[in-house]
Amino acid sequence: MAVVQADKPAMDKLIPHGVQGDQSRIDLDDEQTANAKAIIAATKKTGMDERAAVVSIATALQESKLENLGHLGDRNDHDSQGLFQQRPSSGWGTVEQITDPEYATTAFLKGLKQVDGWQDMPLTKAAQTVQVSAYPDHYAQWEQQAADLVTQHWNS
């Protein structure tokens, strides 16, 4: 039986609606783990809570598998780059900015803050409102892994 440490965020706060649908999980390498930690650090720096970090990490898992992607040539979705696959042509920032994990996370969170009631929405709806993806339901599959990462790294 796992022992829950008092200083770890509670799962009911991280996943207030329960996970939506089937969950995916990938093994993370050191770079991907560092990017998850960078998202958490940027979330804390903006004064947002653990749920915001879960939404952010789940979004980055869907968009880039937590890899800070540069331009992929023919495989690129328009001019999308970075952890959140943000587009310079859509006003997210310069290529240099959106491939900086702190900047990209802060930009995503700025968008999330503008979504009325995001804290009470299912993760996939909150993420989709910011990202405007062609696949709006795909964010939900990463909620458990994102919550696990926040639990593991929020206080580290």
What would you call each of these model-derived segments?
Residues M1-Q5:
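Hydrophobic single-pass membrane-targeting/anchoring helices
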Residues S56, A60, N76-D77, K125, ...:
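Flexible domain-boundary/linker segments
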Residues S56-A58, L83-Q85, T129-Q131:
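Soluble periplasmic/extracytoplasmic beta-strand elements of cell-envelope proteins
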Residues I98-S156:
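Catalytic and binding regions of secreted/periplasmic enzymes and modules that target cell-wall glycans
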